[in-house]
Amino acid sequence: MSQNRKDDHIKYALEQRPGYNSFDEMELVHRSLPKYDLAEIDLSTHFAGRDWEFPFYINAMTGGSQKGSQINEKLAQVAESCGLLFVTGSYSAALKNPSDTSYQVATGRPNLLLATNIGLDKPYQAAQQAVADLQPLFLQIHVNLMQELLMPEGEREFRSWRQHLTDYSQRLDLPLILKEVGFGMDRSTVEEARSLGIQTFDISGRGGTSFAYIENQRGGNRDYLNDWGQSTLQSLLALQPMRDEVELLASGGVRHPLDMIKALVLGAKAVGLSRAMLDLVKNYSVEEVIDIVEGWKSDLRLIMCALSCRNLQELKNVPYLLYGRLKEAQEQIK
């Protein structure tokens, strides 16, 4: 992927105006008599083979350009200081250009919790190289079919994707996460990928950055596809029957701690933030972003206390109300 395309993605992601967000159509039921003290609230979670202190992380965004390198450097500083997981953008650019150091953010940061990302169009050998280069805690594998179809330079051959997923699962010795890129993930996809050996899924729904919008801004002429896909909460609702069978992660349109809590109520093990973090490092100093993220941790505890939930397991039993398009979609889920 060219540096220009990487920078285009950053540019148009920041320019995109927010549209429909399904998080606004879910309401949590307040509890007036609390069970716990604020100090008792436990934010820890578990997915991809290990425990995590907090149920949110910095999701895959960028790399492969000077601008991407600067953003990754800031995000890595925030992640290490706050004890957050940081997932780099797709490592494909570094595979094409071995001199690219925009992903080498762990250098000099022994406490950084780092994972990386690669597209499912890449064969096992490419994934193996990414793992060897970065030694990530897990490998996030993105599926971006609509984005590829809308890119003039995008992939046009997809039959190999299932075989690649099988190869990754059978031959890579680290946890794998299958990730959408803002179009949502349906139950049949999760069931099939699970049969191929995948246990953890970032369902990344519509509501945040739209790569359909971005590719159309880059010169496409299919604006009518800008809102393609299902929202994050639509995807989580559709996957309720599987939430105890697989590990679900949620991203796409997550703006603040209340959105995070709503996703956790619907069974997500953790919540990924991309656009929200991109906005922060663009508009604030690293020190200010660290303060904001630390505030998010406090806010998560505050909201959980208001819901009389001591931990994430108890959050799954919180009653909620749905409205509008989200309620209509939920009623049609089979």
From Swiss-Prot:
Main location as per UniProt: cytoplasm
Keywords: Cytoplasm, Flavoprotein, FMN, Isomerase, Isoprene biosynthesis, Magnesium, Metal-binding, NADP
Residue numbers binding Mg(2+): 148
EC number per UniProt: 5.3.3.2
Protein residues bound to substrate: 5-6, 147
CDD domains, A to Z: IDI-2_FMN
Assembly mode: Homooctamer. Dimer of tetramers.
HAMAP family: Idi_2
Protein name: Isopentenyl-diphosphate delta-isomerase
Organism: Streptococcus gordonii (strain Challis / ATCC 35105 / BCRC 15272 / CH1 / DL1 / V288)
Gene: fni
